[in-house]
Amino acid sequence: MNKEEFDKANVFGKGNSNVNYAQYFIGESFLNPLTEQGKCPVFLANVTFEPRCRNNWHIHHAATGGGQILICIAGEGWYQEEGKEAVSFKPGMVITIPANVKHWHGAKKDSWVVPTKLHQIKKSEIYCVSA
């Protein structure tokens, strides 16, 4: 998907350069929060990855609850859990990531991708805001 097609399909918009979390990414990403942290029981954000951009392996820790849900809005990307094959991520797909599972996600080499992400809460607090 080229940039023009991607911009039309990305209904929530690209957002701003994700400078606060750049250290956790290979390539450039953009963040558009859709809910305000701390004022909503679930943090929802549109994270846009440029082609070849991905985040580092990471874990969303939680003793109870927690986890992450990714919903592919536009473009194509990859999702991988440690010890498993990478999964192609396309518009309309939903990936549920349990707490304490090491994983990464990002764009394919020739496509932008935007997985809208939801961070589930732990005891009424947002416990993870990594993109």
Predicted regions and their residues:
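Conserved hydrophobic/aromatic beta-strand scaffold that supports enzyme active sites
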Residues: L31-P33, L44-T48, I69, A86, ...
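Conserved short histidine dyad/triad with adjacent acidic residue
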Residues: F30, A45-T64
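Short, charged/polar surface micro-motifs in flexible loops or helix N-caps
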Residues: K39-C40, F49-R54, A74-G77, K123-S124
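Ligand-binding loop in jelly-roll beta-barrel domains
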Residues: G38, E85-A86, K90-P91, A99-I126
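A short beta-strand-loop-beta hairpin characteristic of the jelly-roll/cupin
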Residues: R54, T64-P91, V101
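Residue-level recognition of conserved beta-strand positions in structured domain cores
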Residues: N46, I59, I73, E81-G83, ...
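A short, N-terminal "cap"/entry segment at the start of jelly-roll beta-barrel domains
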Residues: M1-F43, I126-A131
